[in-house]
Design a protein with these regions (language model features):
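N-terminal Rossmann NAD(P)H-binding glycine-rich loop of SDR-like oxidoreductase domains
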Residues: 3-23
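Conserved glycine-rich Rossmann-like NAD(P)H-binding loop of the short-chain dehydrogenase/reductase
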Residues: 26-34
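A generic structural motif
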Residues: 23-27, 134-135
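C-terminal substrate-binding/catalytic lobe of Rossmann-fold NAD(P)-dependent oxidoreductases
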Residues: 116, 131-198
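Glycine-/Pro-rich loop/turn segments that contact NAD(P) or position catalytic residues
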Residues: 68-154
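Conserved beta-strand positions in the Rossmann-like core of class I SAM-dependent methyltransferases
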Residues: 4, 28, 137
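NAD(P)H-binding glycine-rich loop region in Rossmannoid oxidoreductase-like domains
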Residues: 35-83
Length: 198
C-alpha cells in the first residue's frame, strides 16, 4: 500500500517507517522541514489543509505519529477528505484510557503537570475523530512507552489501561509500530480506538 506518514523522523514515526518498509509498503514521509528518514520525504505543514492534501493525495492511508500540541485534528481530517485518502491511522496516547470506572489516566492522581498539555491535546484529537465521518483508527499505547525490542507479541484492548500481572503497563515503540501496521493490513478497529500492552 501507499502510506503517507506524518512524523516519519520521530521516535515512533521512524519505527513505523521501518516496519512499513520491511513489510513492502511504499512510504512517503510528510514534514515541515526536510529530514533524513530513509524514506521519500515531502515537505508540507500538517496544519495547512491544502498543502497536506496535496502531499497525501494518491495514498491508501495516512498515519499520524506527531505531537498533538502541534497538530489540529480538524485540519488533518479535512486534508484526508480533500485528498480522497480512505484511511487515517493515528498513534495516540494513554492519557485518555480509563484506569477506573469514569476515571481517565489524565485525571488520575500523579499525572505529571508537564505532560498535561500533550495529553489534553491528544484527548481532544480523539474526540474530534469520534465526531467525524472518516474511517479512522486511534491506537493508544500502554502507560510506559519507549524504545525497546520488537517482540511481535502484544495484547489488544479497548478504552481501559491494561496492566500485566506485576501491575505494569508497558509497550515498546517497535511493537506499537507492528500493531499499527497489523491494523493497516487487517483492519479490525475502523472508527474506533484500541489499546495495546504486554
Amino acid at each position: 500500500m501507499k502510506v503517507a506518514l506524518i512524523g516519519a523522523s520521530g521516535k515512533v514515526g521512524g519505527r513505523l517507517a521501518a516496519e512499513l518498509t520491511a513489510r513492502g509498503h511504499q512510504v512517503t514521509g510528510v514534514a515541515r522541514q526536510p529530514a533524513e528518514t530513509g524514506v521519500v520525504m515531502v515537505v508540507a505543514d500538517a496544519n495547512d489543509r491544502g498543502a497536506l492534501a496535496a502531499a497525501i493525495r494518491g495514498s491508501d492511508a495516512l498515519m499520524v505519529a506527531g505531537r498533538f500540541v502541534s497538530m489540529d485534528a480538524a485540519t488533518i481530517l479535512g486534508a484526508v477528505a480533500d485528498a480522497g485518502v480512505p484511511r487515517l491511522l493515528v498513534v495516540g496516547g494513554a492519557g485518555s484510557l480509563f484506569v477506573a470506572p469514569g476515571l481517565q489516566l489524565i485525571d488520575a492522581p500523579g499525572m505529571p503537570a508537564e505532560f498535561l498539555p500533550e495529553v489534553s491535546a491528544g484527548k481532544r484529537f480523539l474526540e474530534t475523530l469520534q465526531a467525524s465521518d472518516a474511517d479512522w483508527t486511534f491506537l493508544s499505547p500502554a502507560a510506559q512507552f519507549g524504545p525497546g525490542e520488537r517482540t511481535g507479541l502484544y495484547r489488544v484492548g479497548g478504552d481501559d489501561l491494561m496492566r500485566d500481572a506485576q501491575g505494569e503497563s508497558r509497550i515498546s515503540y517497535e511493537d506499537l509500530a507492528k500493531a499499527l501496521v497489523d491494523e493497516l493490513e487487517e483492519p479490525r478497529h475502523s472508527r474506533k480506538r484500541f489499546s495495546i500492552a504486554y
